């Protein structure tokens, strides 16, 4: 039997251009793509502030997971991508605000740059929908 896929879009201008969804649910699994710090208007928020950008990314991730019937408590893995590795601790503390009791597996890594040079951070998440 073929599993049904559900897709979530957040209106990012990049989603239709490059053929991606913000998040995809297949069965009980939800995968949230690299999430940039964009406001509802599609513009970068918190320019120069890695923790502010991380907070916005996690708000978008939370909305996507909930939009597909999941909960943040179902998150099993996150990835933090930074252009400045020295921002790791302040971004990780914001991550901790969202996941204190959940404590998913996590990877933090530095990248050279993102599509928009104002982005300091992107986050990804994988979740399981609890039964």
Q: Across the structure, where does each feature detected by a protein language model lie?
A:
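N-terminal presequence-like segments and the immediate start of the first folded domain
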Residues: 1-59, 63-76, 82-131
């Amino acid at each position: 039997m073929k599993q049904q896929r559900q897709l979530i879009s957040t209106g990012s201008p990049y989603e239709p251009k490059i053929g991606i969804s913000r998040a995809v649910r297949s069965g009980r699994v939800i995968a949230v793509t690299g999430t940039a710090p964009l406001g509802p208007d599609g513009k970068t928020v918190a320019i120069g502030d890695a923790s502010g950008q991380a907070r916005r990314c996690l708000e978008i991730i939370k909305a996507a997971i909930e939009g597909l019937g999941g909960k943040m408590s179902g998150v099993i893995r996150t990835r933090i991508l930074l252009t400045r590795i020295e921002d790791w601790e302040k971004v990780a503390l914001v991550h901790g605000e969202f996941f204190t009791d959940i404590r998913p597996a996590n990877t933090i890594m530095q990248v050279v740059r993102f599509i928009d040079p104002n982005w300091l951070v992107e986050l990804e998440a994988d979740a399981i929908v609890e039964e």
